[in-house]
């Protein structure tokens, strides 16, 4: 992580702070649960005069990480732990170990071809682009990718001795999604997907559909979730005296949301 702070500038009116960090991990817990993320924060504060201050803030974290499947049985990880939690013997499933991930599979034959992989670029966002794979010897069909920054301009004002106002103009949103499977994906004897067999079947048993040509029987798909919100929030507080105050509020926003698969 790197952080830069200017301190007070321009006769103690302006201060700027910026921070950025990078995090990567090949495996967090279960097989295929890697993490690849950036994060950033920027803040600029300017005192217009004794009664008015402006503040600009931007923060976000474009990230990509592999996931485990959400609906695994505890006995698939550990029979001992399952028994401690009250699972009956007849309900125990096959035990695969604590790093079990049914949606991640080690490839017997390295896959070196190009793939459509979600990647983020400034001013272009998340899109599936043809590129080298993250790994040529393992596939995890469950991946999550997001970048949903927050940008806001704040105005703090003392209107008079008894009235203050705080107003924020903001944007919140961005793009992201997750990957999964569509069609038929084969299973192996070890309780995980068999992507070697699925790739071989796609190559030998592609199905023809009118208007679409030959299609693979099992594929990886992406589910997108894009959203953007623009708004203004303002709070006016008035001191009425004798320990009594009145607060007025304004909240106006507009949002756009997209959900689709690709």
What name fits each language-model region?
Residues 5-12, 23, 117-121, 133-135, ...:
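Short, functional N-terminal and low-complexity linear motifs
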Residues 5, 11, 43, 49-52, ...:
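Detector for Asparagine
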Residues 146-262:
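Face-selective signature of the C-terminal outer-membrane beta-barrel domain
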Residues 34, 40-41, 46, 70, ...:
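Sequence-level detector for tyrosine residue identity
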Residues 1-25, 29-69, 77-109, 154:
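Transmembrane beta-barrel wall of Gram-negative outer-membrane proteins
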Residues 23-49, 68-69, 121-156, 217-231:
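Outer-membrane beta-barrel proteins
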Residues 3-4, 13-17, 113-115, 125-128, ...:
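A broad, low-specificity signal for short, low-complexity segments enriched in glycine/proline
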Residues 54-123, 172-207, 259-262:
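A surface-exposed, glycine/aromatic-enriched loop/edge motif typical of exported proteins
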């Amino acid at each position: 992580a790197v952080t830069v702070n200017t301190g007070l500038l321009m006769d103690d009116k302006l201060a700027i702070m910026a921070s950025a960090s990078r995090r990567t991990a090949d495996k967090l817990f279960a097989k295929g649960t890697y993490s690849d993320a950036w994060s950033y924060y920027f803040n600029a504060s300017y005192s217009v005069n004794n009664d008015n201050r402006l503040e600009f803030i931007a923060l976000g974290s474009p990230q990509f990480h592999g996931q485990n499947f959400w609906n695994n049985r505890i006995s698939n990880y550990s029979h001992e732990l399952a028994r401690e939690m009250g699972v009956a013997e007849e309900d125990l499933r096959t035990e695969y170990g604590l790093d079990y991930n049914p949606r991640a599979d080690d490839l017997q034959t390295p896959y070196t071809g190009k793939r459509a992989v979600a990647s983020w670029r400034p001013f272009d966002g998340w899109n599936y682009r043809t590129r080298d794979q993250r790994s040529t010897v393992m596939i995890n069909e469950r991946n999550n990718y997001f970048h949903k920054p927050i940008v806001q301009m704040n105005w703090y004002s003392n209107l008079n001795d008894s009235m203050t106002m705080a107003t924020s103009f903001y944007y919140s949103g961005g793009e992201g999604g997750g990957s999964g499977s569509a069609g038929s994906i084969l299973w192996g004897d070890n309780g995980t997907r068999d992507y070697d067999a699925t790739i071989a079947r796609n190559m030998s048993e592609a199905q023809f559909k009118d208007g679409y040509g030959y299609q693979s029987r099992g594929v990886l798909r992406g589910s997108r979730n894009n959203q953007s919100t623009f708004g203004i929030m303002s709070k006016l507080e008035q001191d009425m005296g004798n320990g009594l105050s009145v607060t007025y509020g304004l909240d106006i926003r507009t949002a756009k949301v997209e959900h689709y698969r690709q």
